[in-house]
Amino acid sequence: MSDNNQATSNASVLTGRVVSDKMDKSITVLIERLVRHPLYGKQLRRSTKIKAHDENNVCQQGDLVRIKETRPISKTKSWTLVDVVEKVEKI
């Protein structure tokens, strides 16, 4: 028998752009995906806004972030920040 000490996670991980960071310890992430139209075959851009938990308030509006699904944190939050992929420059 092999001893596997690492816990495997089935939680889904998504990448998106932060559109709002005005809440304390929370961010709103815009997730975009491409969907093919069933009849015409054209690729359509669909988007979803997801609220995620940002414990240390490290994200700014415009950052590219990776989030993962977790237990429900509040009524609308069940995602948490994994890491910031790309920081936006402040002018």
Curated annotation (Swiss-Prot):
Domain of life: Bacteria
Record keywords, A-Z: Ribonucleoprotein, Ribosomal protein, RNA-binding, rRNA-binding
InterPro entries: NA-bd_OB-fold (IPR012340), Ribosomal_uS17 (IPR000266), Ribosomal_uS17_bact/chlr (IPR019984), Ribosomal_uS17_CS (IPR019979)
Any Gene Ontology biological process: translation
Assembly description: Part of the 30S ribosomal subunit.
Role of this protein: One of the primary rRNA binding proteins, it binds specifically to the 5'-end of 16S ribosomal RNA.
PANTHER family: 40S RIBOSOMAL PROTEIN S11 FAMILY MEMBER, SMALL RIBOSOMAL SUBUNIT PROTEIN US17M
The protein, known as: Small ribosomal subunit protein uS17
Protein's organism: Psychrobacter arcticus (strain DSM 17307 / VKM B-2377 / 273-4)
